[in-house]
Amino acid sequence: MTVVLDRRKSENLWGRFCNWITSTENRLYIGWFGVLMIPTLLTATSVFLIAFIAAPPVDIDGIREPVSGSLLYGNNIISGAIIPTSAAIGLHFYPIWEAASIAEWLYNGGPYELIVLHFLLGVACYMGREWELSFRLGMRPWIAIAYSAPVAAATAVFLIYPIGQGSFSDGMPLGISGTFNFMIVFQAEHNILMHPFHMLGVAGVFGGSLFSAMHGSLVTSSLIRETTESESANKGYKFGQEEETYNIVAAHGYFGRLIFQYASFNNSRSLHFFLAAWPVIGIWFTALGISTMAFNLNGFNFNQSVVDSKGHVINTWADIINRANLGMEVMHERNAHNFPLDLATFEVSATNA
């Protein structure tokens, strides 16, 4: 009899736990994805803060030339970064217990791999948690689908690109200047500015910013007047009121006269779907571009594509970009190799014995 009571009590405890985890009445929804998201993101954030402040220099290139990235080793907020895991480790799984000591783990950049893997798992669970809450509230799944764009972008630069290049040392450093360094080296090695998927991403980000600003300014300008013309229209409203405060027909008419009739939306749902889809699709394409360039399917190469009647090269903008790429590449990892691959290849002219 005691066993039955204990089992019933434990089942009730587990049932209450399940109800609490999946309850939509909590101030912050947890969900089953949240059970994994919370510890992974807390771990990634904690290790990031500690490493950004106090991590010792990391031998990123695997040539016994450590690079300092933390605040206590001479960096500031702008120059500081979590240095990627050493090229000596490559793509190996490198938890703390695989190193001979904590000092060795830090020297080889173990914190970077720990942070990145926990972070990617955490943001993926955050996306799943968005879907889970939407499902329980009877909503459609578009919020999680939209969030998949930044998740795909982060996965591309922190995981897919290192896999394609063969080492976590090629991943994006976790810092401001480290991000810029990653962008410069990426351009030098893959000519990303000439990749059509990157161009679509630029159109998505800048276009999304433009459309967001246009929509916000139209909405805040198209107030339904609740006062006389001698009073401010703002007096007719309370901040946070439930009643609708703007007229989409008026906004549609204004914008249609500003450009042309069919340049504006007269349907609110179509408008907001467009505002969501434009940047999301653009960032999807950028993540796909990074993932293809990870395996060296690079941007277009139009170098020396224009010649005169005598075969002399007429430089175009593509040749200027190529020259800049070579300059950036020759300065990158200058002690790790004698020449970049592009500069080390040449044709041997035939000679008569």
UniProtKB/Swiss-Prot annotation:
- Sites binding pheophytin a sit at 126
The protein's PTM annotation reads: Tyr-161 forms a radical intermediate that is referred to as redox-active TyrZ, YZ or Y-Z.
Does rRNA-binding appear among the keywords? no
Q: What is the annotated localization of this protein?
A: Plastid membrane
- Catalytic reaction annotation: 2 a plastoquinone + 4 hnu + 2 H2O = 2 a plastoquinol + O2
Q: Which GO terms describe its molecular function?
A: chlorophyll binding; electron transporter, transferring electrons within the cyclic electron transport pathway of photosynthesis activity; iron ion binding; oxidoreductase activity, acting on diphenols and related substances as donors, oxygen as acceptor; oxygen evolving activity
Which residues take part in binding chlorophyll a PD1? 198
Transmembrane stretches, start-end: 29-46, 118-133, 142-156, 197-218, 274-288
Coiled-coil portions: none
Indicate the residues removed as propeptide on maturation. 345-353
Instruction: Give residues where N-acetylthreonine occurs.
Output: 2
Which SUPFAM superfamilies does its entry note? Answer: Bacterial photosystem II reaction centre, L and M subunits
The membrane topology of this protein is: Multi-pass membrane protein
Task: List positions binding Fe cation.
Answer: 215, 272
* Miscellaneous field: 2 of the reaction center chlorophylls (ChlD1 and ChlD2) are entirely coordinated by water. Herbicides such as atrazine, BNT, diuron or ioxynil bind in the Q(B) binding site and block subsequent electron transfer.
Record-stated family: Belongs to the reaction center PufL/M/PsbA/D family.
Q: What is this protein called?
A: Photosystem II protein D1
Q: Which species is listed as the source?
A: Cuscuta gronovii
Q: Which gene encodes it?
A: psbA
